[in-house]
């Protein structure tokens, strides 16, 4: 049985889940050690370390059959697990997305293949050509057909609405200016989501913290918050990262669009303007007033 000290939620992790899911998640938190023990026995893994964000708890495990490093991911929201499982199955043809080994969406549980060496791209220099290769893989290796009846995937507009709704709830002391700015940006983003000329499987949360370096330096995407819609959405974080002037944004947009067939530079530029205020919201709430934060906040007009 896994060590309860490993599987019991520490207060900061519990607080993040409470902020995301509300007090109803308390019972799930209490039951987590028993659930992890059952899943570890069922899937033949030994949890070694724990981590996670605001929607799940993740355990680095050793698979008993072959000593392979794998990851057990558990969330209190079965919908989140079902969406991720369906997306990973949709991308099963590409090594540029972490592999799905087993899933029990009803229990909110996924078993994911490890990525070696698995170094996060966040905080490191990255080459546009490498990011472009990842974006090409995501666009070209996903399902050809739109989700059918019974699919867990929802339209990109739903993802957009969720992200802005979360930011609006957290706007807090920024007051009416922040709310007006976010509502204006949300309208722009929803219009883009509704006007996509083509649609495909969208990762939905493709930033540097959710990309690892795999074998041979290949970039590998993890932790999708997937949707079906405009694939240009997935490039937004990459054209905005480290950018703080209109000229630099346009240059990065044109460069990346030139490397990814089907990526529309004008639509990507419009997405950047629509989502800039959303990406800047945490820094603005923290009172930051640096050049980059002001630039992002001003993108929505």
Tell where the protein language model's regions lie, with residue ranges:
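ATP/Mg2+ or Mg2+-diphosphate-binding catalytic cores
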Residues: 20, 251, 279-301
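Juxta-kinase regulatory segment immediately upstream of eukaryotic protein kinase catalytic domains
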Residues: 2-48
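A conserved alpha-helical element in kinase catalytic cores
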Residues: 30-33, 55-57, 66-111, 115-138, ...
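Active-site acidic catalytic loop and adjacent metal/ATP-binding pocket
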Residues: 48-64, 100, 187-233
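An alpha-helical support segment within catalytic cores of ATP-dependent transferases
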Residues: 27-36, 143-203, 214-215, 257
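A glycine-centered beta->alpha junction motif in the catalytic cores
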Residues: 77, 94, 106-125, 140-144, ...
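Active-site Asp-x-Gly
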Residues: 213-258, 265
